[in-house]
Curated annotation (Swiss-Prot):
Species lineage: Bacteria, Pseudomonadati, Pseudomonadota, Gammaproteobacteria, Enterobacterales
Cofactor: Mg(2+)
Record's protein name: Ribonuclease T
Known function: Trims short 3' overhangs of a variety of RNA species, leaving a one or two nucleotide 3' overhang. Responsible for the end-turnover of tRNA: specifically removes the terminal AMP residue from uncharged tRNA (tRNA-C-C-A). Also appears to be involved in tRNA biosynthesis.
Annotated catalytic residues: H181
Amino acid sequence: MADKSDLNALSGRFRGFYPVVIDVETAGFNAKTDALLEVAAVTLKMDQDGWLQPDETLHFHVEPFEGAILEPAALAFNGIDPTNPLRGAVSEYDALHEIFKVVRKGIKDRGCNRAIIVAHNATFDHSFMAAAAERCSLKRNPFHPFATFDTAALSGLVLGQTVLAKACITAGIAFDSSQAHSALYDTNQTALLFCELVNRWKRLGGWPLALEESSLEDTSAED
């Protein structure tokens, strides 16, 4: 069985996965046709006692790709004006290239094998990240192609809430609804929420697992 220091490391906690919190703001629901307008990422780290906490934050306003659909209802919902020059928007390639570079370094520094997206209703964010990476021909995508950690599902289990604002408030995390639907704000709050869910499970005695070494070896042999 791994010693305590390994179980307190990020690589030991999530089976070699490096969790990165992602939130995207978009001009619709179709990842293939609708514009990615904003993306933020928060990397995570463990302290020496195995408590999860936010680490580095990245944030980009993104230029719509050529031919992208801009759904008026989506723009009204998130309040983004894609034509506003004050956004300081960058290309999809530049935004994802920088995020991927930081994530790959984190994977290496933390001794992990691959990154995994953490997001609220994660299928949505994962699909837009994957579609943008494909459009930009970014072949070294560090994120798992389909697995995610979904804080909506985890919050439903732990807190009885699935809406981000309600889950945060129930968990004792402040949430300013006037800042919601900003990728930067939502990512930061989702990161705090995920850390609280993971740390709460630890405080309740759910981690580390009380398994014998032989049981872990048997499971590893089956993988």
